[in-house]
């Protein structure tokens, strides 16, 4: 924006590169920021998924009600269970 001083009539360009930090945001800088955000998000997801210490290669001992799959399957009406004759 061009500002004109009413007293002196001098004009000042307020859109100079030093006044707006977005002018320094190049695509390369944006990609670096995006990569850092993605890496941090992946680290957080990894830490959350392995917070109880169990993974697919060495599953840890789980309490009895840790995964109530049996209860869930019994309560699911959409599972076709074989009937005894």
Swiss-Prot record:
The UniProt keywords, alphabetically, are: Membrane, Viral envelope protein, Virion
Specify the superkingdom: Viruses
Task: Please verify whether the record's keywords include Transmembrane.
Answer: no
InterPro entries, per the entry: Baculo_ODV-E18 (IPR019655)
State the signal peptide span.
Answer: none
**Could you tell me which Pfam families the record lists for this protein?**
ODV-E18
Query: One GO cellular component from the entry?
Result: membrane
Annotated localization: Virion membrane
What's its job?
A: Component of the polyhedra envelope.
In its UniProt entry, what is this protein called? Answer: Occlusion-derived virus envelope protein E18
